[in-house]
């Protein structure tokens, strides 16, 4: 079994390799991030933490809205890219499950598609709650069980292997939120690709080819890709990849 530190290092490296091309492939991240913003209650607080900021796309949104933004990410390469874009006011390399921040130091915690990579969702939410001031708000978007189901089915048909990440069921995400006043919403988002190669590139382009079990999918030969394509379900003339998105808003009492 791989250690937690090794897992976190591998995840950071996977996203670090994607830093330069992340925004070109990050349609899902933008869609979920904008939806999360729409679900958040209005809040006048000035201090914002973008937890798992990636390239800083939404850090920039908050900064342009007049907030003082701390961009935090596990990947030094992602942070460097965000810094180049002048996305935030402050940049922190760190782990959501062990935030290098004082208690009650921000008004808003915003985390778009990051906590699914954490080892313990309750610990991650507890840390975000800890650093948020009373009266503040924590908003997160994450992936739930059933995400990448078409790709998972294709691999199962091809060779019987599990080559996609497993995500938490909605019930487990809900249980992690129970200590707090909160509300959750689950929605399905489907991305359609012209071929399986483009689909796989989209995952690699956003750094999401890391597997929780410590395995990596490896390179696909042309023959292997053709075989996977033959096993992949088609829809509307394309290759679908669905995501089960869970949006959560927690109120800091």
From Swiss-Prot:
Pathway membership, UniProt: Cofactor biosynthesis; biotin biosynthesis
GO molecular function annotations of the record: carboxyl-O-methyltransferase activity; malonyl-CoA methyltransferase activity; S-adenosylmethionine-dependent methyltransferase activity
Stretches that traverse the bilayer: none
Superkingdom per UniProt: Bacteria
SUPFAM superfamilies: S-adenosyl-L-methionine-dependent methyltransferases
Described function: Converts the free carboxyl group of a malonyl-thioester to its methyl ester by transfer of a methyl group from S-adenosyl-L-methionine (SAM). It allows to synthesize pimeloyl-ACP via the fatty acid synthetic pathway.
One Pfam family per UniProt: Methyltransf_11
Record key words, sorted: Biotin biosynthesis, Methyltransferase, S-adenosyl-L-methionine, Transferase
Name of the gene: bioC
Disulfide bond is among the record's keywords: no
This protein's record includes keyword S-adenosyl-L-methionine: yes
One biological process term in Gene Ontology: methylation
Enzyme Commission code: 2.1.1.197
Principal EC category: transferase
Protein name: Malonyl-[acyl-carrier protein] O-methyltransferase
HAMAP family: BioC (MF_00835)
Family per record: Belongs to the methyltransferase superfamily.
CDD domains associated with the record: AdoMet_MTases
Catalyzed chemical reaction(s): malonyl-[ACP] + S-adenosyl-L-methionine = malonyl-[ACP] methyl ester + S-adenosyl-L-homocysteine
